[in-house]
């Protein structure tokens, strides 16, 4: 995988650099800017040194991509590389059409097809991770007032088994269950049961100067996003009620930040749906009197299109 084996075929890195405008746009959706030279340097010189099997020509093998992402988001981590591996992960998951045009076929052990089991169909839900990426980790000082009880959990979703697609014609898919990306909130394998109630806002055991409990914020992980995406395979246009119900639950339990919302937009909505959400949301901005705002500067202040300066402060 990843080798330009015949004339006209490009490696994953070459293909992504050839279509770097897409990479740059995806980064822009997170409010970040990227550089093609920096991406090439990371792919050819930095990530191969992580010891997880990353080839210098790049790869679309999700296991390897997730392993690199785990290191980048780890402790101490590589904050300057976060946006690059995040967008690379998005491309690995979404597989835009230009990958096929470049001849970048899915890795035999990386393209996962989720198939419902005939017996006891319930989807596994991955637990939360105990650590957070250093890039956007911060302490939040909250009131000592107890949180309202969480809403009743939704009905169990069908269980899925991760079936590895065999791209070799005539062979049966490998039915072994793929382990989860390394950066899960508990380090357990995919499908393993973990402790419940692991929410992003977690008490640290310390208190601030006023005596209020100090909590640490933990952003979404790849596992969180995969679970939510797999639980709602239909697009927002096809099943808006399902997606809205999921978002209501996520906002209630996770209190997502601006960065988290960008992750949710990219995971649960198509490009067209994202643009529609942004457009309609800006139309719904109201002032303190409940009157619709038309001043673009005020709209931008309340509904920023790019990552605001106060994020992560």
Curated annotation (Swiss-Prot):
Keyword tags: Capsid protein, Host cell membrane, Host membrane, Host-virus interaction, Lipoprotein, Membrane, Myristate, RNA-binding, Viral budding, Viral budding via the host ESCRT complexes, Viral matrix protein, Viral nucleoprotein, Viral release from host cell, Virion
SUPFAM superfamilies (UniProt xref): Retroviral matrix proteins, Retrovirus capsid protein, N-terminal core domain
Pfam families associated with the record: Gag_MA (PF01140), Gag_p30 (PF02093)
InterPro entries: G_retro_matrix, G_retro_matrix_sf, Gag_P30, Retrov_capsid_N, Retroviral_Gag-Pol_poly, Retrovr_matrix
Disulfide bond annotation, renumbered to this chain: none
Motif PPXY motif, chain ranges: 154-157
One Gene Ontology biological process: viral budding via host ESCRT complex
Chain segments annotated as coiled-coil in the UniProt record: none
UniProt feature, compositional bias: Polar residues: 172-183
GO CC field: host cell plasma membrane; membrane; viral nucleocapsid
Transmembrane segments: none
Sequence motif PTAP/PSAP motif, residues: 127-130
UniProt-annotated stretches for the region Disordered: 113-135, 167-197, 280-313
Listed GO MF terms: RNA binding; structural constituent of virion
Lipidation (N-myristoyl glycine): 2
UniProt xrefs under PANTHER family: GAG_P30 DOMAIN-CONTAINING PROTEIN
Protein name: Gag polyprotein
Species name: Avian spleen necrosis virus
Organism ancestry: Viruses, Riboviria, Pararnavirae, Artverviricota, Revtraviricetes
Gene name, Swiss-Prot/TrEMBL: gag
């Amino acid at each position: 995988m990843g080798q330009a084996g015949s004339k006209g075929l490009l490696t994953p890195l070459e293909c992504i650099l050839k279509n770097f405008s897409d990479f740059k746009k995806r980064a822009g959706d997170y409010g970040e800017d990227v550089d093609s030279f920096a991406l090439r340097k990371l792919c050819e010189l930095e990530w191969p040194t992580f010891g997880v099997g990353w080839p210098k020509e790049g790869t679309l093998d999700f296991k390897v991509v997730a392993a690199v992402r785990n290191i980048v988001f780890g402790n101490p981590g590589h904050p300057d590389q976060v946006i690059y591996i995040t967008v690379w992960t998005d491309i690995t998951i979404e597989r835009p059409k230009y990958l096929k045009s470049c001849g970048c076929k899915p890795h035999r052990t990386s393209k996962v097809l989720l198939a419902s089991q005939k017996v006891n169909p319930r989807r596994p839900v991955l637990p939360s991770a105990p650590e957070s990426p250093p890039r956007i980790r911060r302490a939040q000082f909250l009131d000592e007032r107890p949180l309202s009880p969480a809403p009743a959990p939704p009905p169990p979703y069908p269980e899925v088994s991760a079936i590895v697609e065999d791209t070799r014609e005539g062979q049966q898919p490998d039915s072994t269950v793929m382990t989860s990306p390394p950066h899960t909130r508990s380090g357990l394998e995919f499908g393993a049961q973990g402790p419940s109630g692991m929410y992003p806002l977690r008490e640290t055991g310390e208190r601030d100067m006023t005596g209020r409990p100090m909590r640490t914020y933990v952003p979404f992980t790849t596992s969180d996003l995969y679970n939510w995406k797999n639980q709602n395979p239909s697009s927002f246009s096809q099943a808006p009620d399902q997606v809205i119900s999921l978002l209501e639950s996520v906002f209630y339990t996770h209190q997502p930040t601006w960065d988290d919302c960008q992750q949710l937009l990219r995971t649960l909505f198509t490009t067209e749906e994202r643009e529609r959400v942004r457009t309609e949301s800006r139309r719904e901005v109201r002032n303190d009197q409940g009157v619709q705002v038309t001043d673009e500067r005020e709209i931008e202040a309340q509904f920023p299109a790019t990552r605001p300066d106060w994020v992560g402060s």
